[in-house]
Amino acid sequence: EEWAGALREMASENAALLLPAHGEALTDPERIQENLTVLAEALEWVVAHTKAELNKGTRQDLVYRSLEVPDYLLTHPTLNQQYVSWEDISKMVMRRYVGWWDDIPSHWSPASFDAQSAVITELAGGVAALDRRARALLETDVVMASHIADWAWFGHPGDPLAQRLLIDVYAHRIVNTDSNTQEILAW
């Protein structure tokens, strides 16, 4: 909410120059005002939607998946998704209002991700089984393929097949236009 307020305040100053993080400098005061205003409106929309869903008791992992952003915001050139998605902003809003608790009972005192991954890998039939499944999903569900690659890697970080899978899946995810992943950490 503070971000939206700050953007509206900046828009009211009739600035003659705006240097955005991406793209060319803006020098038309009307265009600057419109850009700042639509950014504020977008943030306000996400905050309002997120808070309304939380107040209805919607589980957090479903709140950000329930976003149905109005077309005029989705198609506005100023709101071209670069690094942060609408869902990411909703998650930030939730973190502010509800903290770390995500309504999933096992997350209260969870096992480490490494331990969870080792058990998931074992249940799946080993790293090779996860490798086959993740690669089968690469073209249709890169997000799920990423989860599977993470389980293989974190469950068995010394396994060369797990490392190759992790690298291949995230290299694919970087170039996938449906994902806002821009970089990768490779071990």
For every predicted segment, state its role.
Residues 2-62, 66-101, 105, 169:
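Divalent-metal (often Zn2+) His-rich catalytic cores of metallo-beta-lactamase-fold enzymes
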Residues 169-176:
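TPR/TPR-like alpha-solenoid repeats
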Residues 58, 124, 157-160:
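Short coil turns that delineate tetratricopeptide repeat
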Residues 144-150, 177-187:
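Alpha-helical repeat scaffolds
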Residues 2, 62, 144-145, 161:
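Alpha-helical positions within canonical tetratricopeptide repeat
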Residues 131-132, 161-167:
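Alpha-solenoid helical repeat scaffolds
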Residues 116-155:
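Alpha-helical segment of the N-proximal tetratricopeptide repeat
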